[in-house]
Amino acid sequence: MTNTFSIGNNMNVGLGAPLLLIAGPCVIENEEKTLEIAERIKGIVRDMDVNFVFKASFDKANRTSIDSFRGPGLEQGLAILGKVKSRLGLPVISDVHSPDQVGPASEVLDILQIPAFLCRQTDLLTAAGNSGKPVNVKKGQFVGPWDMKHVTGKVLSTGNERIMLTERGSSFGYNNLVVDFRNFSIMRDLGFPVVFDATHSVQMPGGLGSCSGGDRSYVPLLARAAAAAGVDGVFFEVHTDPDKALCDGPNSLTMEMLESILPQLLAIRKAAS
């Protein structure tokens, strides 16, 4: 039985809950752009049966190059996410990279996200668990789905059972990822809601030399397959102009693509239930 739990004040994720949508730009570029993207997505999903959580990173600590844009940092980034909450009434999620970030982040964020590259870091997982907030752990590209039992065990050791797991592809040779759709069933059998990160799954890590490439045209295909497989949520990086995005533009969706794919996912989910 998949665990079902609450997010924020009036939202559930898991068995029987509406489709969870985690969406937003890869990184906080500035306050104006962040609020614009959040408001656009909110408008798109207004009449859809989805639970929308806005996502943007205050720091992209694992960019390919030292010259890559990382974001505004913890303090300024959390302030901007706080404005998304207060002005638009949206729950928010962002990455935490070290135990010392968990305290201030948990004062603003509705969900703490553990990056894929850090999914085995015990101190980070237990700190996130001790916050009492829901924890979204992204499965590392190098981790088997069954190994997430040990990852979730670290969070569970704190008494926090509000855990979700996100599939974002597995390393397939150099500079490429592939999605094993068995992973959704395997991780759901661990007892936790499963989310599919469809945009990072088409990423080509380091594929452009000093930054990552990707191909957003495959996102709808993979997302539809994941909906048929019974995922509890989907994760999309979305931008008003992906080709000018400061991070992960090649794999980010346009607003028009998001508006097109969501009704398809809801129809597939209904048919498969």
Curated annotation (Swiss-Prot):
One of its GO terms (cellular component) is cytoplasm. It is an enzyme of class 2 (transferase). This is 2-dehydro-3-deoxyphosphooctonate aldolase. Pathway: Carbohydrate biosynthesis; 3-deoxy-D-manno-octulosonate biosynthesis; 3-deoxy-D-manno-octulosonate from D-ribulose 5-phosphate: step 2/3; Bacterial outer membrane biogenesis; lipopolysaccharide biosynthesis. GO terms for molecular function: 3-deoxy-8-phosphooctulonate synthase activity. It holds the Pfam family DAHP_synth_1. Belongs to the KdsA family. InterPro entries: Aldolase_TIM, DAHP1/KDSA, KDO8P_synthase. It catalyses: D-arabinose 5-phosphate + phosphoenolpyruvate + H2O = 3-deoxy-alpha-D-manno-2-octulosonate-8-phosphate + phosphate. Signal peptide: none annotated. Keywords: Cytoplasm, Lipopolysaccharide biosynthesis, Transferase. It comes from Desulfatibacillum aliphaticivorans. The gene is kdsA. The keyword 4Fe-4S does not apply. One of its GO terms (biological process) is keto-3-deoxy-D-manno-octulosonic acid biosynthetic process. It is found in: Cytoplasm. Its EC number is 2.5.1.55. The keyword Transport does not apply.
